[in-house]
């Protein structure tokens, strides 16, 4: 693959020998080192099961790794099970009441709409939705919706719909000016480009690890700022929160983000994620961004030249490009499958997401398929 593999990572991903995989926005393949970590965990569970208990201590290593990745501190990191759990922790912990409102935009993930519609019905809150304009949602679109009764402003840092990458700081400033919490679902962002929770003004962030973080299912790092941590009420309890046992079955609970780690986690998934974060750190997130956003730009230009209508706005700085399909979905799927090119085809759209192991040649191969779909 020569110069088309500037990161030198293609050999780490066996899938590249079999097909052109441009679907990491759905599920990313994992590198060999992560496979090895997961295999080692399962082998030890089979042959030395009592040693699995020692993995509890490795949580602190994982917290430190993720904290470095997002410019936080380890005591601001909890280890949850899924992205959806993070926003539920925020929504339940703020004790929303009738008359409060939550502001999202229509490029957000479905979980948020399910959550806040349920809270509309059960607690009488109001869900306010900023509309997108040609695939973008700017701070100016949020501004009219945020007021003194806004408790949460929630966005997907990068939209799963079209890869739109929000300009976070202006939205954070609007939220904070009214005393609201700024939360982000970052599953389509962490691992794709450098994340700085301080510079962005994010109060809380959660992300599953099976997409751009190159790991498995069942673990989702959760960042919560110290200031917000002090405001959140706990809605679930268990032994993993305990800092100190007191007489007569009383307990002193952790005051750091570990207070949200209430029960045993998926230790195998945690081991895989630790290996994946080490891999990402070795390759370099900034280098990954330069390569993958470059591939996405090449793809965007090619699709535009072919005459496709694009849902992704021009100049967008993410690794996801979505085009509208004009042919029947069955025909579109068949065209990509015949070429052994994996993308997401659904709801009249084609989402294409190059990752660190993809090459410019593969983008050109994809464009050969889309040329036949004009």
Regions found by a protein language model. Name each.
Residues 1-374:
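Pyridoxal 5′-phosphate
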């Amino acid at each position: 693959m020569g110069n088309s593999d500037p990161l030198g990572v293609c050999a780490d991903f066996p899938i590249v020998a079999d097909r052109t995989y441009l679907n990491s926005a759905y599920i990313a393949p994992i590198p060999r080192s992560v496979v090895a970590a997961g295999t080692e965990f399962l082998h030890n569970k089979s042959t030395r099961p009592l040693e699995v208990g020692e993995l509890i201590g490795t949580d602190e290593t994982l917290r430190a790794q993720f904290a470095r990745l997002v410019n936080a501190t380890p005591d601001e990191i909890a280890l949850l099970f899924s992205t959806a759990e993070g926003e539920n922790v925020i929504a339940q912990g703020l004790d929303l009441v009738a008359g409060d409102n939550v502001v999202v935009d229509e490029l957000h993930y479905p979980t948020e709409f399910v959550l806040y519609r349920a809270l509309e019905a059960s607690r009488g809150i109001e869900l306010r939705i900023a509309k997108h304009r040609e695939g973008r949602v700017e701070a100016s679109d949020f501004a009219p919706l945020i007021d003194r009764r806004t408790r949460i402003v929630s966005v997907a840092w990068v939209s799963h719909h079209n890869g739109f990458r929000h300009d976070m700081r202006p939205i954070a400033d609007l939220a904070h000016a009214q005393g609201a919490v700024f939360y982000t679902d970052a599953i389509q962002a962490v691992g794709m480009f450098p994340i700085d929770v301080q510079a962005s003004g994010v109060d809380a962030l959660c992300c599953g690890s099976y997409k751009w973080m190159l790991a498995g299912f069942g673990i989702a790092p959760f960042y919560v700022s110290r200031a917000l941590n002090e405001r959140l009420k706990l809605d679930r309890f268990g032994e993993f929160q305990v800092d100190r046992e007191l007489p007569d079955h009383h307990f002193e609970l952790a005051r750091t983000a570990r207070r949200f780690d209430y029960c045993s986690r998926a230790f195998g998934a945690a081991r895989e994620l630790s290996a994946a974060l080490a891999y990402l750190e070795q390759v370099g997130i900034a280098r990954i961004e330069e390569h993958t956003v470059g591939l996405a730009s090449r793809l965007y230009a090619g699709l535009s030249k072919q005459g496709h209508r694009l849902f992704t706005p021009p100049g967008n700085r993410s690794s996801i490009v979505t085009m509208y399909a004009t042919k029947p979905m069955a025909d579109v799927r068949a065209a990509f499958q015949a070429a052994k090119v994996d993308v997401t085809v659904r709801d009249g759209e084609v989402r294409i997401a190059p990752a660190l192991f993809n090459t410019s040649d593969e983008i050109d191969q994809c464009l050969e398929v889309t040329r036949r779909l004009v």
